[in-house]
Amino acid sequence: MGVQPPNFSWVLPGRLAGLALPRLPAHYQFLLDLGVRHLVSLTERGPPHSDSCPGLTLHRLRIPDFCPPAPDQIDRFVQIVDEANARGEAVGVHCALGFGRTGTMLACYLVKERGLAAGDAIAEIRRLRPGSIETYEQEKAVFQFYQRTK
């Protein structure tokens, strides 16, 4: 039986979710129970007990706390989500608390998936996950991604 990880919520139901750092084996089981088969970890250190659920593939994109992702990290994240979703598999993404780095990646994915302008994607993520995208540099990363992809 799984236990909901802190700050878990769907951004695209059944396809893409954000969460804080999973700390218990039961957090990973919760993700598996919901169909999440890929976990993108944005922390510099890997999440504890990540080997407790062999059905969950861990993808590491190390980003320092309060920093924006690099363009190649955003591109890799989008690729992971697209490939997993094409197979009917959901993706979870986490940083430490699930706000800054996580929110930035989620907003970039909304730019790509829904064709939203950067400001609209940021506003939507903040509506769904209040407190997300914590720094000017993280906001700027979403705007730069939008400029690169429009």
Swiss-Prot record:
Known tissue expression: Widely expressed. Highly expressed in spleen, prostate, colon, adrenal gland, mammary gland, thyroid and trachea. Expressed at lower level in uterus, small intestine, bladder, bone marrow, brain, spinal cord and stomach.
Main location: cytoplasm
Pfam families according to UniProt: PTP-SAK
Catalysed reaction equations from the record: O-phospho-L-tyrosyl-[protein] + H2O = L-tyrosyl-[protein] + phosphate; O-phospho-L-seryl-[protein] + H2O = L-seryl-[protein] + phosphate; O-phospho-L-threonyl-[protein] + H2O = L-threonyl-[protein] + phosphate
Record SMART domains: DSPc (SM00195), PTPc_motif (SM00404)
GO cellular component: cytoplasm; cytosol; nucleoplasm
GO biological process: cilium assembly; dephosphorylation
Domain (Tyrosine-protein phosphatase) ranges: 7-150
Descriptive protein name: Dual specificity protein phosphatase 23
GO molecular function ontology, one term from the record: protein tyrosine phosphatase activity
